[in-house]
Design a protein with these regions (language model features):
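A short, N-terminal "cap"/entry segment at the start of jelly-roll beta-barrel domains
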Residues: 1-23, 36, 142
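N-terminal regulatory/effector-sensing and dimerization cores
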Residues: 19-116
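Amphipathic alpha-helical segments enriched in hydrophobic/aromatic residues interleaved with Lys/Arg
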Residues: 106-159, 163, 189-191
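A ubiquitous short alpha-helical element
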Residues: 119-127, 174-177, 204-205
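N-terminal positioning helix adjacent to the helix-turn-helix/winged-helix DNA-binding module
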Residues: 128-131, 135, 156, 178-189, ...
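Alpha-helical structural elements of signaling/regulatory helical domains
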Residues: 131, 145-148, 181, 198, ...
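Basic/polar phosphate-binding segments, predominantly the helix-turn-helix DNA-binding elements
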Residues: 163-168, 176, 192-196, 200-238, ...
């Protein structure tokens, strides 16, 4: 059975809990051994597959479940709160693939895939089918072979992206102004905030960049992301800060300024409110 082969392959590669980033270009694999009631994370734009165990994303209006039957599609960087369901003998085993826009553009140019201009960017679950499992199995079998990783893995990644783009929520991977200019503007601004997290943002400037009124921009941004633009900016900064704090020989003060805070006390206060402990508690020094 394909999924059993995939589980064994990931288990063999990751002996202990953790994540291997860019095991091939644009692909991470991960293993989580313990259940957790509430985990705050920031997911990048892309696709997340789980082959064993389960995760739930807690939205204001619903719960999104992804597991061995359903995968996750994200059209932009998204701060989320999750529940994790894992056991010592059955850890979560998963894989994440970047949404490479160049590959996506090539697929769309050479296929008949099209989308409605009413399709919204956001975060969605989609059913995992045998075509995708077969492609994923072949991709994972490349990981221990350097030549396969260089030559075959990019072909399998493109194949996986093709099947995802053909799915009912495949539009979430591709947000261009061709489909809906306003949705594209929100998606683009969210990507810019994620990449340029050091910058200072205010809602009036963001709305002007999107060519929208402030109130319309605020409402549309919240409709798509589930949070206001300023909440989104703050969460992106704090998640990036948490990532930086896990680096060796770094201080809370340097991280605060690195992510764009002028006030260390404000940074400490907002960090503790979000994660339940201070930045200093997180530091590895």
């Amino acid at each position: 059975m394909l999924i059993k082969n995939i589980r064994k392959s990931i288990n063999d590669i990751i002996e202990d809990e953790g994540t291997i980033k860019n095991i091939v270009d644009g692909v991470d694999i991960f293993k989580i051994s313990k259940s957790q009631e509430s985990v705050k994370q920031c997911y990048k734009k892309g696709i997340i597959f789980i082959f064993q165990g389960k995760k739930e994303i807690l939205n204001e209006k619903s719960i999104l479940t992804y597991d061995e039957n359903n995968y996750l599609i994200l059209s932009m960087a998204t701060p989320v709160e999750c529940r994790v369901y894992a056991e010592d003998d059955k850890p979560i085993l998963g894989l994440r693939i970047d949404a490479d826009q160049k590959i996506i553009n090539d697929i769309l140019f050479n296929s008949n895939i099209s989308y409605s201009n009413e399709s919204k960017p956001g975060i969605y679950t989609e059913s995992l089918n045998n075509n995708l499992l077969d492609s994923l199995n072949r991709l994972i079998n490349c990981f221990n072979n350097e030549e396969y990783s260089k030559i075959l893995a990019p072909l399998y990644i493109k194949e996986i992206l093709y099947f995802v783009l053909k799915s009912p929520h495949g539009y979430a991977l591709n947000y261009s102004s061709y489909y809906n200019e306003n949705y594209y503007s929100i998606s683009k601004i969210a990507d810019d905030i994620y990449i340029n997290y050091k910058e200072k943002y205010d809602i009036n400037t963001l709305a002007k960049t999107a060519n929208m009124s402030t109130s319309y921009f605020h409402n549309l941004f919240k409709e798509i992301t589930g949070m206001s633009p300023i909440q989104y900016v703050k969460k992106i900064k704090l998640h990036k800060a948490r990532e930086l704090l896990l680096s060796p020989k770094i201080t809370a003060k340097s991280v605060a300024y690195e992510v764009g805070y002028d006030s260390l006390s404000q940074f400490n206060r907002e960090y503790k409110r979000m994660f339940g402990h201070t930045p200093k508690d997180e530091c590895h020094i």
